[in-house]
């Protein structure tokens, strides 16, 4: 086939597809009933856009440089104080648990030392009280 014939056939196929697609009603966009589209558009505008006074009031309240209301400041402070209290309680609980652990370890260590000392004294006891080593009289 010649290049001219291939281009001609592809153009005819493209025109045919466009003609069929133009008459078919698409699911996304309707080609007729334009008055319904206008009414839907007005309803959509009312649902999407707010009145100018409401918009300016919203932007004044929420602007970056505008001051916060007392209620907003108080709410933020309450949240901050509650978070500080939770953090303080958590660290206090952790500190108490560690102190209890250290106290138990010290008690166990003291008990082991006392037992070792008693065993040493029993093993080295010579029948005298206090032991013979401390009762020597050097001449």
Swiss-Prot record:
<keyword id="KW-0175">Coiled coil</keyword>
<comment type="similarity">
    <text>Belongs to the UCMA family.</text>
</comment>
<keyword id="KW-0964">Secreted</keyword>
<feature type="signal peptide">
    <location>
        <begin position="1"/>
        <end position="26"/>
    </location>
</feature>
<protein>
    <recommendedName>
        <fullName>Unique cartilage matrix-associated protein</fullName>
    </recommendedName>
</protein>
<feature type="modified residue" description="4-carboxyglutamate">
    <location>
        <position position="93"/>
    </location>
</feature>
<feature type="modified residue" description="4-carboxyglutamate">
    <location>
        <position position="108"/>
    </location>
</feature>
<feature type="modified residue" description="4-carboxyglutamate">
    <location>
        <position position="122"/>
    </location>
</feature>
<feature type="modified residue" description="4-carboxyglutamate">
    <location>
        <position position="97"/>
    </location>
</feature>
<feature type="modified residue" description="4-carboxyglutamate">
    <location>
        <position position="115"/>
    </location>
</feature>
<dbReference type="Pfam" id="PF17085">
    <property type="entry name" value="UCMA"/>
</dbReference>
<feature type="modified residue" description="4-carboxyglutamate">
    <location>
        <position position="85"/>
    </location>
</feature>
<feature type="region of interest" description="Disordered">
    <location>
        <begin position="60"/>
        <end position="117"/>
    </location>
</feature>
<keyword id="KW-0301">Gamma-carboxyglutamic acid</keyword>
<keyword id="KW-0272">Extracellular matrix</keyword>
<dbReference type="GO" id="GO:0045667">
    <property type="term" value="P:regulation of osteoblast differentiation"/>
</dbReference>
<feature type="modified residue" description="4-carboxyglutamate">
    <location>
        <position position="118"/>
    </location>
</feature>
<feature type="modified residue" description="4-carboxyglutamate">
    <location>
        <position position="111"/>
    </location>
</feature>
<dbReference type="GO" id="GO:0005576">
    <property type="term" value="C:extracellular region"/>
</dbReference>
<feature type="modified residue" description="4-carboxyglutamate">
    <location>
        <position position="104"/>
    </location>
</feature>
<dbReference type="InterPro" id="IPR031386">
    <property type="entry name" value="UCMA"/>
</dbReference>
<feature type="modified residue" description="4-carboxyglutamate">
    <location>
        <position position="99"/>
    </location>
</feature>
<feature type="modified residue" description="4-carboxyglutamate">
    <location>
        <position position="89"/>
    </location>
</feature>
<feature type="modified residue" description="4-carboxyglutamate">
    <location>
        <position position="103"/>
    </location>
</feature>
<keyword id="KW-0732">Signal</keyword>
<feature type="coiled-coil region">
    <location>
        <begin position="70"/>
        <end position="123"/>
    </location>
</feature>
<keyword id="KW-0765">Sulfation</keyword>
<feature type="modified residue" description="4-carboxyglutamate">
    <location>
        <position position="72"/>
    </location>
</feature>
<feature type="propeptide" description="Ucma-N">
    <location>
        <begin position="27"/>
        <end position="65"/>
    </location>
</feature>
<feature type="modified residue" description="4-carboxyglutamate">
    <location>
        <position position="76"/>
    </location>
</feature>
<feature type="compositionally biased region" description="Basic and acidic residues">
    <location>
        <begin position="68"/>
        <end position="98"/>
    </location>
</feature>
<dbReference type="GO" id="GO:0031012">
    <property type="term" value="C:extracellular matrix"/>
</dbReference>
<comment type="function">
    <text>May be involved in the negative control of osteogenic differentiation of osteochondrogenic precursor cells in peripheral zones of fetal cartilage and at the cartilage-bone interface.</text>
</comment>
<feature type="modified residue" description="4-carboxyglutamate">
    <location>
        <position position="92"/>
    </location>
</feature>
<feature type="modified residue" description="4-carboxyglutamate">
    <location>
        <position position="105"/>
    </location>
</feature>
<dbReference type="GO" id="GO:0048706">
    <property type="term" value="P:embryonic skeletal system development"/>
</dbReference>
């Amino acid at each position: 086939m010649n290049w001219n014939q291939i281009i001609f056939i592809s153009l005819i196929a493209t025109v045919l597809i466009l003609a069929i697609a133009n008459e078919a009603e698409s699911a996304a966009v309707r080609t007729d009933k334009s008055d319904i589209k206008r009414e839907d558009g007005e309803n959509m505008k009312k649902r999407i856009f707010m009145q100018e006074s409401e918009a300016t009031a919203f932007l004044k309240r929420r602007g970056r440089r505008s001051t916060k209301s007392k209620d907003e400041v108080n709410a933020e402070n309450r949240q901050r104080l509650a978070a500080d209290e939770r953090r303080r309680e958590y660290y206090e609980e952790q500190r108490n648990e560690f102190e209890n652990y250290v106290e138990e370890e010290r008690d166990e260590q003291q008990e082991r030392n006392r037992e070792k000392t008693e065993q040493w004294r029993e093993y080295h006891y010579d029948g005298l009280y206090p032991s013979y080593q401390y009762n020597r009289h050097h001449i």
